[in-house]
């Protein structure tokens, strides 16, 4: 999974009074993980509330790692998690997004009339200079760790865990959960990618419905 973005032309000054406003403070919030006291920014995109930062909860195992085992990357990118560590890492009241939830977020974000591609709306301005980061999602390119334990793609692409519950085609009973990294951006397009399966990837969460 990789993200390649061509820089946009500099925006011209706008005088139109009907211009879509940037995000307001009311659309942002905070969440404190009571397990370790970490405070996260949150953002609202459509009807969904997302963590606006990568998860940083430390596990008492090797199921979470810092990129290249170098803590200079931690504050910005958080931990990379293995599939085995996901359930323990997620705090109460939040969940790993499904394929449908990622698709819903992407579809809503791309409604912006100024949206060249979804990264121009949800990437951090530090990563993509031309991004408006309108909703405060602030996606960062945290890279991944592959099956050979090699770290790769830092500052180039973002890889996030996604979950799907399999359904028996006959009984329609919900079966095991399937985990994979899900969001792929390339040449201005985006799609769910269930072929990209690194050993460790970043985590963003969606707030449970109230």
What spans do the regions from the language model cover?
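Conserved positions within compact, well-structured domain cores
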Residues: 3-5, 13-210
């Amino acid at each position: 999974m990789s993200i390649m973005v061509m820089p946009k032309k500099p925006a011209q000054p706008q005088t139109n009074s009907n211009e879509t406003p940037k995000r307001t403070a009311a659309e942002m919030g905070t969440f404190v993980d009571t397990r370790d006291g970490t405070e996260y920014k949150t953002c609202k995109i459509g009807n969904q509330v997302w963590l606006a930062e990568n998860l940083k909860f430390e596990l008492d195992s090797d199921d979470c790692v810092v990129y290249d085992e170098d803590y200079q990357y931690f504050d910005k990118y958080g931990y990379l998690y293995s599939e085995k560590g996901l359930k323990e890492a997620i705090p109460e009241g939040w969940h790993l997004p499904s394929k449908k939830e990622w698709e819903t977020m992407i579809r809503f974000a791309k409604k912006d009339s100024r949206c060249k591609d979804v990264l121009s709306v949800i990437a951090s301005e530090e990563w993509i200079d031309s991004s408006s980061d309108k909703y405060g999602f602030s996606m960062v390119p945290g890279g991944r760790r592959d099956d050979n334990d090699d770290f790769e793609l830092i500052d180039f692409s973002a890889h996030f865990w996604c979950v799907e519950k399999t359904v028996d085609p006959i009984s329609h009973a919900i079966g095991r959960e399937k985990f994979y990294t899900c969001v792929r951006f390339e040449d201005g397009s985006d799609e769910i990618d269930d072929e990209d399966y690194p050993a460790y990837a970043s985590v963003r969460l969606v707030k449970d419905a109230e």
